[in-house]
C-alpha cells in the first residue's frame, strides 16, 4: 500500500493483537515486520520504550534517528508526576530542557502515552513545546472517554473502544478512579 513512499516520521505507540486478522496480519511476527518496513521508509522514528516489542526497534534499525518516550523506562521524553482523574490526565514532562505541565481532557494512562507521542512529533517538526501543550489542552474527541453530565452526578462515560486492548485500556482507566462495579 505504501511502496515507493518516503515518510518524514513514523510513530510506534504499542504492539498488540489489535491488527491480527485475515484482513490485516496473520500473526504478530508479520505485524512487527510490517512496522519495521514503515520505519525503514522514514528518516525519523518515535517509539514508546515502555512497550517491550517496540523498544527493540533502535537495535534493529540503528541508522534511523529514533526519539523515545515513556512513563516507566529511561527515555528522552519522560512523563512524571502523573495525575489521572475521571475527566483528564495531568503530568510533568521535560521538553527541550524545560519542565512543562501537560493537561489532556481524556482520562487514562493511554492518554499520557498519546500526548507524549504528539509532543515528540511536534519536537521533530520544530513546533514550539508551548504550542503543542496548548493544543493538547484543547483536545476533545466525541465518543472517546467522554463524560456525560447528569443530575445525580453519577460518573457516566461514553467510549468507542472496539478491540480487546482498547476496551482493557478504558476499563483500567475507569477502574482507577471508581469504587465497585464498572458497567
Question: Where are the model-predicted features located?
Answer:
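Acidic, Mg2+-coordinating active-site environments of NTP-dependent enzymes
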Residues: 2-156, 179-180
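Active-site beta-alpha connecting loops in nucleotide-dependent enzymes
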Residues: 141, 164-183
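Conserved phosphate/oxyanion-binding catalytic-loop motifs
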Residues: 159
Amino acid at each position: 500500500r505504501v511502496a515507493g513512499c518516503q515518510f518524514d516520521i513514523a510513530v510506534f505507540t504499542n504492539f498488540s493483537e489489535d491488527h491480527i486478522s485475515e484482513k490485516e496480519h496473520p500473526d504478530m511476527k508479520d505485524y512487527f515486520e510490517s512496522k519495521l518496513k514503515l520505519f525503514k521508509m522514514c528518516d525519523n522514528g518515535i517509539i514508546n520504550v515502555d512497550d517491550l516489542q517496540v523498544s527493540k526497534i533502535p537495535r534493529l534499525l540503528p541508522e534511523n534517528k529514533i526519539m523515545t518516550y515513556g512513563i516507566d523506562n529511561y527515555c528522552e521524553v519522560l512523563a512524571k508526576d502523573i495525575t489521572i482523574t475521571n475527566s483528564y490526565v495531568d503530568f510533568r514532562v521535560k521538553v527541550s530542557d524545560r519542565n512543562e505541565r501537560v493537561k489532556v481532557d481524556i482520562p487514562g494512562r493511554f492518554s499520557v502515552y498519546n500526548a507524549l507521542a504528539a509532543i515528540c512529533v511536534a519536537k521533530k517538526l520544530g513546533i514550539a513545546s508551548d504550542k503543542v501543550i496548548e493544543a493538547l489542552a484543547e483536545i476533545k474527541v466525541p465518543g472517546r472517554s467522554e463524560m456525560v453530565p447528569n443530575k445525580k452526578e453519577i460518573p457516566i462515560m461514553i467510549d468507542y473502544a472496539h478491540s480487546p486492548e482498547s476496551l482493557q485500556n478504558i476499563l483500567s482507566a475507569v477502574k482507577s478512579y471508581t469504587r465497585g462495579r464498572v458497567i
